[in-house]
């Protein structure tokens, strides 16, 4: 689960990390008063969406102006006008795709005197099963670009969970960032607070980009991005309360309510599969035969008829879907349950696109019988390769 920048900074503030004072507004009329509560004389007006690259992005609407989603105001009146330009508009960045995201919140914060821009992040390294720090002197830009062009400017190391974090980890980060003197002590304290927050809040990723050195020599987190482990949200009610469902794909949101593992993609062939590995293989073979998957969807091993029905409805709600491939290898998941769910969904929402079904495993004959006697226009397949070829042919001709 992701949260907005203003929410991330509130968390940073709780854990003693240095951040600018700021206010969030949802109406342009509130912006002038919000900016007036801050010191000024420079205000930063930021669009709040769950995507990076806001400053380099652009708005679809001409009314929003030609600048990106991070703008500077030199008066409270200008802050109000900038908020008015951005609220309700669609911001497009390299992470949103051409669809973009609507801006429903604006964060106004005090400007900062920037001497240097640095990069600092914590993430779960799945290779080592540890929390890793990533630090670079090249802040204020995409870390992917730095990694590709100047990888030597990135320092990364993990923390042994048995011994935990020590001061030398903080000093290692400080030296990697080129800090000296009192800044090293600030960095050690910051690293301790960030690590404690990362562990206590069950985070998957915490990125501060940029972490700035101000002209007075102090450090400050100028931007923050946080991601949390969905599987741990049951014990993080305060984090769950920060969830902004308007920032999530409606189909992914609906899937989460039925415990379906769904990720929307850009292709034309919808997939319903049981098991993440088989789902990945299904997507790969669709691409192999010349088409693109419209989604990743794992219904899991203990799916019910209702769950399968909902999964099918989510797939068919995507206007880009031109065909559907159901690929089930029944172990715990019974093929007859899948068949009953498909039939129930088709009766409810109809079937306007080709449907290829490949069933194998537990109760496979019963599943095929149920589909065969349903009267549905279903294309049967014997194996995965056969199924992929048939759905691609049905869609592309």
Swiss-Prot record:
<comment type="function">
    <text>Succinyl-CoA synthetase functions in the citric acid cycle (TCA), coupling the hydrolysis of succinyl-CoA to the synthesis of either ATP or GTP and thus represents the only step of substrate-level phosphorylation in the TCA. The beta subunit provides nucleotide specificity of the enzyme and binds the substrate succinate, while the binding sites for coenzyme A and phosphate are found in the alpha subunit.</text>
</comment>
<feature type="binding site">
    <location>
        <position position="274"/>
    </location>
    <ligand>
        <name>substrate</name>
    </ligand>
</feature>
<feature type="binding site">
    <location>
        <position position="109"/>
    </location>
    <ligand>
        <name>ATP</name>
    </ligand>
</feature>
<feature type="binding site">
    <location>
        <position position="223"/>
    </location>
    <ligand>
        <name>Mg(2+)</name>
    </ligand>
</feature>
<keyword id="KW-0547">Nucleotide-binding</keyword>
<dbReference type="GO" id="GO:0004775">
    <property type="term" value="F:succinate-CoA ligase (ADP-forming) activity"/>
</dbReference>
<keyword id="KW-0067">ATP-binding</keyword>
<dbReference type="InterPro" id="IPR017866">
    <property type="entry name" value="Succ-CoA_synthase_bsu_CS"/>
</dbReference>
<keyword id="KW-0816">Tricarboxylic acid cycle</keyword>
<feature type="binding site">
    <location>
        <position position="112"/>
    </location>
    <ligand>
        <name>ATP</name>
    </ligand>
</feature>
<dbReference type="GO" id="GO:0005524">
    <property type="term" value="F:ATP binding"/>
</dbReference>
<dbReference type="GO" id="GO:0005829">
    <property type="term" value="C:cytosol"/>
</dbReference>
<feature type="binding site">
    <location>
        <begin position="331"/>
        <end position="333"/>
    </location>
    <ligand>
        <name>substrate</name>
    </ligand>
</feature>
<keyword id="KW-0479">Metal-binding</keyword>
<dbReference type="InterPro" id="IPR005809">
    <property type="entry name" value="Succ_CoA_ligase-like_bsu"/>
</dbReference>
<dbReference type="InterPro" id="IPR016102">
    <property type="entry name" value="Succinyl-CoA_synth-like"/>
</dbReference>
<dbReference type="InterPro" id="IPR013650">
    <property type="entry name" value="ATP-grasp_succ-CoA_synth-type"/>
</dbReference>
<comment type="pathway">
    <text>Carbohydrate metabolism; tricarboxylic acid cycle; succinate from succinyl-CoA (ligase route): step 1/1.</text>
</comment>
<feature type="binding site">
    <location>
        <position position="209"/>
    </location>
    <ligand>
        <name>Mg(2+)</name>
    </ligand>
</feature>
<dbReference type="InterPro" id="IPR013815">
    <property type="entry name" value="ATP_grasp_subdomain_1"/>
</dbReference>
<dbReference type="GO" id="GO:0006099">
    <property type="term" value="P:tricarboxylic acid cycle"/>
</dbReference>
<dbReference type="Pfam" id="PF00549">
    <property type="entry name" value="Ligase_CoA"/>
</dbReference>
<dbReference type="InterPro" id="IPR005811">
    <property type="entry name" value="SUCC_ACL_C"/>
</dbReference>
<dbReference type="GO" id="GO:0000287">
    <property type="term" value="F:magnesium ion binding"/>
</dbReference>
<feature type="binding site">
    <location>
        <begin position="53"/>
        <end position="55"/>
    </location>
    <ligand>
        <name>ATP</name>
    </ligand>
</feature>
<comment type="subunit">
    <text>Heterotetramer of two alpha and two beta subunits.</text>
</comment>
<keyword id="KW-0460">Magnesium</keyword>
<dbReference type="GO" id="GO:0004776">
    <property type="term" value="F:succinate-CoA ligase (GDP-forming) activity"/>
</dbReference>
<feature type="binding site">
    <location>
        <position position="117"/>
    </location>
    <ligand>
        <name>ATP</name>
    </ligand>
</feature>
<dbReference type="InterPro" id="IPR011761">
    <property type="entry name" value="ATP-grasp"/>
</dbReference>
<feature type="domain" description="ATP-grasp">
    <location>
        <begin position="9"/>
        <end position="254"/>
    </location>
</feature>
<keyword id="KW-0436">Ligase</keyword>
<protein>
    <recommendedName>
        <fullName>Succinate--CoA ligase [ADP-forming] subunit beta</fullName>
        <ecNumber>6.2.1.5</ecNumber>
    </recommendedName>
</protein>
<dbReference type="Pfam" id="PF08442">
    <property type="entry name" value="ATP-grasp_2"/>
</dbReference>
<dbReference type="GO" id="GO:0042709">
    <property type="term" value="C:succinate-CoA ligase complex"/>
</dbReference>
<feature type="binding site">
    <location>
        <position position="46"/>
    </location>
    <ligand>
        <name>ATP</name>
    </ligand>
</feature>
<comment type="similarity">
    <text>Belongs to the succinate/malate CoA ligase beta subunit family.</text>
</comment>
<dbReference type="GO" id="GO:0006104">
    <property type="term" value="P:succinyl-CoA metabolic process"/>
</dbReference>
